[in-house]
Regions:
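Extended, low-polarity segments enriched in aliphatic/aromatic residues
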Residues: 1-191
Length: 191
């Protein structure tokens, strides 16, 4: 181990974020970045390459853009919209309403409905629903996803001192956010 402290950039609940303007952003106007990332005086990234089911592969740009996004930022990059409630599965328990800091879920006629004008896309309602009735459209295109990742990366590094190290070792075919790891798809190259 390095002996370095671990700091969860967007806080323990994923809600400690800063909205960073993306100058010239076509897909993202304000990136939702973990506050600790933007509070740092210098940004140093140590990343490794891996395959990625949606982006094609993940390296420095993908790891910074997606990795530094807050919970809501990750949601914004991965999806093409805000959550909705599958009415036939909703039991009207109100758990989504209780967890939402913005009051977006409203219970109407015993069922939840999400007010998209109030919703910030954090996804907490999705995680708390006992019937998986709160859903998101995950059908973002690869091109749109990669453009959003690039714009999020720009928000993190633009106008500040940065240093990046990329490693080509143990390159797995899929994103390493999965608990399992597969055989490397290329030989180890190093830095």
């Amino acid at each position: 181990t390095t002996g370095c402290q671990i700091i969860i950039a967007d806080g323990l609940k994923g809600s400690d974020e800063v909205e960073v303007p993306v100058v010239g952003g076509e897909y993202v106007k304000n990136a939702k970045i973990g506050r600790a990332v933007m509070d740092a005086d210098v940004f140093i990234s140590l990343t490794h390459f891996k395959g990625h089911e949606e982006a094609g592969f993940g390296g420095c740009l993908k790891n910074i853009g997606m990795g530094c996004g807050s919970r809501a930022g990750k949601m914004e990059q991965h999806n093409a919209g805000k959550p909705h409630v599958a009415q036939k599965h909703c039991i009207g328990c109100g758990q989504c309403r209780k967890i939402c800091a913005h009051g977006a879920p409203i219970i109407t006629d015993g069922k939840a409905v999400i007010d998209h004008d109030r919703c910030v896309g954090c996804g907490r309602c999705i995680a708390v629903c006992p019937k998986d009735a709160v859903r998101i459209d995950w059908d973002e295109t690869t091109t749109n996803l990669n453009c959003k990742i690039a714009e999020y990366t720009k928000a993190v590094v633009d106008g500040r001192p940065c240093f990046h190290i990329s490693l080509v070792i143990d390159v797995s075919p899929n994103c390493d956010c999965h608990s399992e790891n597969d055989m490397a798809i290329v030989p180890n190259v190093g830095m």
